[in-house]
Each structure stands twice: as C-alpha cells, then as structure tokens.
Amino acid sequence: MTVWLLIGFLLPVAIFAAPPINRLALFPDKSAWCEAKNITQIVGHSGCESKSIQNRACLGQCFSYSVPNTFPQSTESLVHCDSCMPIDSVWDVVTLECPGNEEFPRVDKLVEKILQCSCQACGKELSQEGAMFNVYLNTAEETLSPAETLGHHHHRPPAREEDSPAQSQREGESEE
C-alpha cells in the first residue's frame, strides 16, 4: 500500500518536471537521445532542374507517455510528449534553373538548414512563415507580396530591348 502511495506522490512530481525528459523512473536503463545526422537533400520544383545539397535531419528517440485518467477527474491529465526536432536552424535560398521556361528561368526555394536538434515538447515548432519572411526581408532583389514569401520565389528574366522604355526605367530604378 505504501508503495502505491509513494508512486502516486512521486509520479506526478516526476511528470511535471521541466521537459525534456531524459530518463523515466519506470525504465531507468533507457535514455532519450536526439541528434542532427548529415544527409544529402534533393531540392526540386516542377519544370526545373533539381539540386543536391548537404543538410542535416533530426533523428532520435524521445519520451512520451500517458497515465490513465479517472472520472470524475481528481488531478490534471498526466500526458507528456517529446519529439526530436531542430532547436537551431537557418534558412538558405537555393536557386534552381528552369530551362525552357522563358517567363521564369529560375526559381528560389527556401530550405531550412538544421544546425542542432534535441528532444522538445511535441507541437513546439519554429515559425516557418516568420523565418521565411525574414529571409526575404534581407534580400534586396525584389519586393515580394506575403503570398510569395510562403513558398518559392520566381526570378523574372532581365528586360529585353523590345520592352517598353517605361518598363526598363522602372527596373533600373529598383536596382539602385
């Protein structure tokens, strides 16, 4: 009986400890692990030539558990979930060539380059939209609409001689 009282008291204390959890009392010989592993990533886009880049992927085994509940509920639900995910990353622009596409001969793809991984609470993900928006704020090539910052960016070909003088002047002003 005292063992169950002890477990009933210590289990909630252990459960509500600051995440991530590296060891569980029920499995003292097992520990969580998460690391960034080198990979070759293929970046592609329809109608464009793919590129191979060096990147990292998060790989590991993190703890999650759910303790049976009671009704009526006497304590908060005892559920915990950790996942191996990036804790440090940068966004790079990878430019793909699109031969045969005169309107958009190149496409920029944003790629998350993972630097470091660890066990983090499930659902805790970095804001991809905010990170992508910052990448485009720091590039001075073109002004983009918010919709363009959420996926890929098309490069328009340089102005040709047959373009109108007003169009050529506008493009010249945007480069200065």
Swiss-Prot record:
Transmembrane segments: none annotated. GO terms for cellular component: extracellular space. It comes from the Eukaryota. Keywords: Cytokine, Disulfide bond, Secreted, Signal, Tumor suppressor. Residues 1-17 form the signal peptide. Residues 34-123 form the CTCK domain. One of its GO terms (molecular function) is cytokine activity. The keyword Signal applies. It is found in: Secreted. Residues 148-176 are annotated as: Disordered. InterPro entries: Cys_knot_C (IPR006207), Cystine-knot_cytokine (IPR029034), DAN (IPR004133), Neuroblast_suppress_tumour_1 (IPR016728). Disulfide bonds join 34-84, 48-98, 58-117, 62-119, 81-122. Gene3D superfamilies: Cystine-knot cytokines. May act as a tumor suppressor. Cytokine that has an axial patterning activity. Acts like bone morpho-genetic protein (BMP) antagonist in embryonic explants. Blocks the bmp2 activity. Belongs to the DAN family. Interacts with bmp2; the interaction is blocked in presence of nog. PANTHER family: GREMLIN 1, NEUROBLASTOMA SUPPRESSOR OF TUMORIGENICITY 1. This is Neuroblastoma suppressor of tumorigenicity 1. It comes from Xenopus tropicalis (Western clawed frog).
